Amino acid sequence: MDALALSAGLKLPWLLGIAALVAMRDTARKPDAPGEAAWIVGAGYLVGAFMLTLWMRVLSHAGIRFGALAIGAPLLLLAAVLAWVAWRRHGGAALITAALGALRALVAPPHATRATRIAWQLLLAWLVLRYALLALEVIWQPLYPWDAWIQWATKARVWYEQGRIEPFARSAAWFAAGSGVWFDASPDYPPTMPLLQVWTCIALGR
């Protein structure tokens, strides 16, 4: 169940970013142009993740507590609207044809010799195995005390428990404040990464 929740939490910003990129792309460029699908899928998560954290900032500023519905439902609706815009602008048939063509080219590159194709497929299989092992490592192992712990996860833990973005400060300001501010080794770091961690916690429910 955790794996399904985590997968859904990761896919929402990814699909949102892909829909946004396709909706905004130049209609003069064919959807099946070489490399088009690759860069859209590759950049889709970065765009969607940034949009996700922007929305979380808006919710926090508006005093709305972080939650699966408050964050996920509007973004899912936005992704559906952007997908509809992309469908209307570029034509559904053209997009489906481009997506299927990209999948075929990924598995069996056109104009490649038999030996090159086999080598490419072996490389893909190795990458799939590598990412599967990395996913298991992320799921099974605790958070290591590196940057993820001392500078990112501290904020994520507080923001998740409080349901909003809370201020952090260095030790001197923390001692002087007495309350209302939290301590962190790097309070000036951008909040994007901790907010992504908060969203992951919300997707998992813990």
Language model features with spans:
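Short alpha-helical segments used as structural interaction elements across diverse proteins
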Residues: 8, 54, 114, 127, ...
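Internal/C-terminal transmembrane anchor helices
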Residues: 107-134
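Membrane-embedded, hydrophobic transmembrane alpha-helices
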Residues: 1-111
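Short hydrophobic/aromatic-rich motifs at helix boundaries and adjacent loops
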Residues: 24-30, 124-129, 166-170
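Structural signature of transmembrane alpha-helix termini at the membrane-water interface
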Residues: 23-24, 55-62, 83-87, 129-140, ...
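Low-complexity, intrinsically disordered, cysteine-poor segments enriched in small/polar
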Residues: 95-109, 121, 138, 155, ...
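Alpha-helical transmembrane segments at the extracellular/periplasmic loop-to-helix junctions
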Residues: 4-18, 120-126, 130, 187-194
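Active-site lumenal/periplasmic loops and adjacent helix-entry segments of GT-C-fold
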Residues: 131-206
